[in-house]
From Swiss-Prot:
Compartmental location: Cell membrane
General function of this protein: Structural component of specialized membrane microdomains known as tetraspanin-enriched microdomains (TERMs), which act as platforms for receptor clustering and signaling. Plays a role in various cellular and molecular mechanism through its association with both integrin and non-integrin proteins. These interactions facilitate critical cellular functions, including cell-to-cell communication, wound healing, platelet aggregation, trafficking, cell motility, and angiogenesis.
Lipidation (S-palmitoyl cysteine): 11, 15, 242-243
Organism name: Bos taurus
Record's subunit section: Interacts with integrins ITGA3:ITGB1, ITGA5:ITGB1, ITGA3:ITGB1 and ITGA6:ITGB4 and with CD9 and CD181. Interacts (via the second extracellular domain) with integrin ITGAV:ITGB3. Interacts with ITGA3; this interaction modulates ITGA3 glycosylation pattern. Interacts with F11R. Interacts with RAC1 and CDC42; these interactions mediate physical association of RAC1 and CDC42 with integrin adhesion receptor complexes.
Name of this chain's protein: CD151 antigen
Amino acid sequence: MGEFGEKSTTCGTVCLKYLLFTFNCCFWLAGLAVMAVGIWTLALKSDYISLLASGTYLATAYILVVAGIVVMVTGALGCCATFKERRNLLRLYFGLLLIIFLLEIIAGALAYIYYQQLNAELKENLKDTMTRRYHQPGHEGVTSAVDKLQQEFHCCGSNNSRDWQDSEWIHSGEAGGRVVPDSCCKTVVPGCGRRDHASNIYKVEGGCITKLETFIQEHLRIIGAVGLGIACVQVFGMLFTCCLYKSLKLEHY
């Protein structure tokens, strides 16, 4: 009976080791995906961050990058801990899994909360940002973001083209007689913003605010889904780790 019990325990331990190793390989790839989503958001989808009053969108992306890096390191540590059968390494591995789990839950929660608050924030701040900071010294990022927003989404002004009547730049001598920025034009040529007829500029119902809101919400959904999805998978990793730790403890005694 003793020999049978020892063989059963050893067999169970081996199975757990391979389960955890398989999990760690998948986990490492998941970490790469999480980091990629965070970097993708920062590098390619962050053009409009200067138009947002809150830093939540940016913070969420940074959390994903950090979580992705830690996940990859943890995955490598998990493989090492599994095959060396070192219980102290398994404890460290479990602790890191727990930290990553919390980071991804926070990222997902922030994305969800900001998703709910985005409409109110844009309504409160976007028009003011566009009219007061466009083409103003020290706000080159806002100017670039507004021009890209209006050209990429074929819109003009926060709510409509009339918003530009309140622009500090339009009322200054620097506007050169323009009534809207040139980026409002369907075909951008220098000075085209002097004529705001519908045949010349974009007059989209809802203005740029609805376009920007939809754009950011789509990416918040991706960030939230990735963060929470990987967090759910990690529960299995923590479970396998606990089982292997317990199995090694029983064999030790």
